[in-house]
């Protein structure tokens, strides 16, 4: 849920600040939560000032969510008569993203398939990584490129495959620090 993710982001930001010997309120950060949904938030001097609405599928596509979709085509689908409102909501958030393309949200299983030569899985997972990197790059513009650090968190942050490829695309923006896991209960 988005409230828990926001709490997790603040907790991770405070932990990072403490590790750096500074205060959260003195930092400008991009925090990317990599889970069933992918949220990217800009934290400026102790306040979250911008974020995508990952719960409704905005931003990069993820294991369960479609990500930002072309509005015109979405309108066509909505009025096609093929789907109910609930069916469409499930197709955008829950049965979308990696699930729609590869039939699973299991990132380690997808990576294993890639290692065994599955080119489709590699293409889809690399597309997700590309979309995450692009969104993080866009978030950097909110801070005029003056980003103290990029913090990566969530269950997918355990994946060396994803983190290493993400770092290749975004390391020029700011130092990257990885805090794998959800950590949402500790944040409460």
Name these PLM-found stretches.
Residues 1-29, 36-37, 45, 49-105, ...:
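Glycine-rich phosphate-binding loop plus the immediately following alpha-helix
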Residues 33-39, 156-160, 184:
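Gly/Ser/Thr-rich loops at beta-strand to alpha-helix junctions
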Residues 41-52, 161-171:
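Acidic-glycine-rich active-site phosphate/pyrophosphate-binding loop
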Residues 47, 106, 157, 183-184:
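Short, glycine-/Ser/Thr-/acidic-enriched flexible segments
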Residues 90-145:
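Adenine-nucleotide phosphate-binding core of ATP-dependent small-molecule kinases
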Residues 144-156:
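Short glycine-rich phosphate-binding loop at a beta-alpha junction
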Residues 160, 164-188:
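Conserved phosphate-binding/catalytic loops in two-lobed NTP-binding clefts
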């Amino acid at each position: 849920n988005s409230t828990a993710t926001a709490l997790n982001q603040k907790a991770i930001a405070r932990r990072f600040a403490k590790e750096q010997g500074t205060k959260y309120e003195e930092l400008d950060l991009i925090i990317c939560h990599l889970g069933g949904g992918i949220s990217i938030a800009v934290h400026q001097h102790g306040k979250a000032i911008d974020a995508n609405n990952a719960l409704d599928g905005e931003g990069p596509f993820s294991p369960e969510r479609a990500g930002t979709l072309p509005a015109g085509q979405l309108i066509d689908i909505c009025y096609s008569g093929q789907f109910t409102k609930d069916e469409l909501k499930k197709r955008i958030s829950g049965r979308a993203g990696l699930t729609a393309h590869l039939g699973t949200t299991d990132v380690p299983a997808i990576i294993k398939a890639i290692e065994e030569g599955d080119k489709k899985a590699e293409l889809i997972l690399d597309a997700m990584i590309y979309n995450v990197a692009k969104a993080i790059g866009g978030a950097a513009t909110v801070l005029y490129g003056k980003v103290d650090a990029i913090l990566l968190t969530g269950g997918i942050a355990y994946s060396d495959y994803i983190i290493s490829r993400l770092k290749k695309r975004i390391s020029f923006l700011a130092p990257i620090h990885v805090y794998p896991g959800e950590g949402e209960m500790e944040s409460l």
